[in-house]
Amino acid sequence: MMSAMTILVLNGPNLSRLGKREPEVYGRQTLDDINRELAASFPELSFDFFQTESEGALLEKLFNCEDKGGYRGVVLNAGALTHYSIALRDAISAITIPVVEVHLSNIYAREEFRRKSVISEVCAGVISGFGANSYHLGVRALLGMTSLEPD
């Protein structure tokens, strides 16, 4: 069983390329840098970091975190899947664990096709446009939502 405050940090397609792909948009930090900073900023928490290029693997991880138990929330950067994955939307709505959608860039200030999130309506909230700090804000949001709930 996991600690009482394990947070799943779930990253989708292309996030493995952080630091290399469009650094003017996404920054120069790698995903490993972001994960290390997140863990150091919240030493009282346990994190499960997962990144995949596969939509199916994201769905499986969401379902497994619900079935396995011990998770208090999910910070999700679904990458491009944000804009079109009805399967991901359905998976989020099928679990009871709160999911906070995060984005490094402000998706609402980008190209038209990036301004629509099909998962926002089934997430607990959305944090967008604060670079790597979006992940920190996502964790803080989950802590605010779950701190008073019993294990």
Curated annotation (Swiss-Prot):
Signal peptide stretch: none
CDD domains for the chain: DHQase_II
Pfam families per UniProt: DHquinase_II
UniProt binding sites for substrate: N77, H83, D90, L104, S105, R114
UniProt record similarity statement: Belongs to the type-II 3-dehydroquinase family.
Annotated EC: 4.2.1.10
Subunit-structure text: Homododecamer.
Record's keyword terms, sorted: Amino-acid biosynthesis, Aromatic amino acid biosynthesis, Lyase
GO annotation, biological process: amino acid biosynthetic process; aromatic amino acid family biosynthetic process; chorismate biosynthetic process; quinate catabolic process
GO molecular function, one term: 3-dehydroquinate dehydratase activity
Pathway: Metabolic intermediate biosynthesis; chorismate biosynthesis; chorismate from D-erythrose 4-phosphate and phosphoenolpyruvate: step 3/7
Protein name: 3-dehydroquinate dehydratase
Catalytic residue list: Y26 (proton acceptor), H103 (proton donor)
Catalytic activity: 3-dehydroquinate = 3-dehydroshikimate + H2O
Originating organism: Pelodictyon phaeoclathratiforme (strain DSM 5477 / BU-1)
Origin: domain of life: Bacteria
InterPro entries: DHquinase_II (IPR001874), DHquinase_II_CS (IPR018509), DHquinase_II_sf (IPR036441)
Gene expressing this chain: aroQ
Annotated site residues (Transition state stabilizer) in this chain: R21
Family matches, as NCBIfam families: aroQ, PRK05395.1-2, PRK05395.1-3, PRK05395.1-4
Biological role stated in the UniProt entry: Catalyzes a trans-dehydration via an enolate intermediate.
